[in-house]
UniProtKB/Swiss-Prot annotation:
Keywords tagged on the record: Amino-acid biosynthesis, Arginine biosynthesis, ATP-binding, Cytoplasm, Ligase, Nucleotide-binding
Reactions listed under catalytic activity: L-citrulline + L-aspartate + ATP = 2-(N(omega)-L-arginino)succinate + AMP + diphosphate + H(+)
Top-level taxonomy: Bacteria, Pseudomonadati, Pseudomonadota, Alphaproteobacteria, Rhodospirillales
InterPro entries named in the record: Arginosuc_syn_C (IPR048268), Arginosuc_syn_N (IPR048267), Arginosuc_synth (IPR001518), Arginosuc_synth_CS (IPR018223), Arginosuc_synth_type_1_subfam (IPR023434), AS_cat/multimer_dom_body (IPR024074), Rossmann-like_a/b/a_fold (IPR014729)
Pathway note: Amino-acid biosynthesis; L-arginine biosynthesis; L-arginine from L-ornithine and carbamoyl phosphate: step 2/3
Protein location: Cytoplasm
A GO molecular function held by the record: argininosuccinate synthase activity
Listed name of the protein: Argininosuccinate synthase
Recorded family membership: Belongs to the argininosuccinate synthase family. Type 1 subfamily.
Amino acid sequence: MKGEVKKVVLAYSGGLDTSIILRWLQDQYQCEVVTFTADLGQGEELEPARAKARLMGIKEENIFIDDLREEFVRDFVFPMFRANALYEGVYLLGTSIARPLISKRQIEIANMVGADAVSHGATGKGNDQVRFEMGYYALKPDIKVIAPWRLWDLTSRTKLLDFAEKHQIPIAKDKRGEAPYSTDANLLHISYEGKALEDPWVEPFEDMYTRSVAPENAPDKPTYIEIEFEKGDAVAIDGVRLSPAALLTKLNELGGANGIGRLDLVENRFVGMKSRGVYETPGGSVLIVAHRAMESLTLDRGESHLKDELMPRYAELIYNGFWFAPERIAIQTMIDKVSENVSGTVRLKLFKGVASVVGRKSPKSLYRMDYVTFEEDSVYDQRDAQGFIKLNALRMRLAKMARG
């Protein structure tokens, strides 16, 4: 492998697995390694990643730690929420939507430093390998991709730990007795997968959850909040305007405190197998309820129903790694156009695991009380309904007459 690659940009968390990958790249390719660590709001201190990269011989100018929280929410999470995207009807795509931003920034760094390759720590069984690499190739078609989990012989946790000890890679004390699941986190969600959770019959441990209280332990008094929208995006909570990242952070706090946002599902991976995942998405779970309520007031029936028809396809594209695909961009263009009228305020009640809409208002509301009232009105002639019904029933009447 020596000489195949001159410089590689590694998506680096600073954890054990990507530190092993870093050393493996140095050994196998004898190339210059550039580390990239993204702050997506995972709630971890990232400076230790810089220290560990230095310890492993990475030059200071080759260490990138970027705060991408605002870009993540503004340019990836919010556009996705304009579509009300749910994969297989329930999953808010917290992991899926983070991957294209990481890929994008990796390629930007590769262009900056003149790297001819990129590398990631996703395994050969999961969706993330697809998501990362789809992004790489979409943005830089001639880039070389190194996926160590598909190449090396470190096929067990024991072999990984032995490799780390042999190469003097620091091993955290808890790594020999690891948590009985793996996690992935960002500002939108945290996921728990694998190990003890692989059996879909096993109930998740209560002490596993970090972003929400159990619904039954949530406060006995509901929390009322108001979310203001402009052109499909949330911009304020209770009248206080916030940046995209700050707003999602606040919704996470409010939703989590009221036991909202837990999800346990078995999903269909793009690579063909099913997997069981447990997720906490408190802020996102509140936001999607509020957004749909705002749309119900401001979108025409045809617009709304067309969006609902396209949503499963849109969500599947994101889940499968096609964020940069032309069809995803085309659907997004339609969604963004429709969202220009989605402005106003939604009032919600957060109570013991449920976010309920209790009020909505908009300067662009299509709801007309003078038309819908059960009292006497002067704008709607109920006699018009007779011809409307007859015309819509005509094809069924003809079918019955012809077929009996």
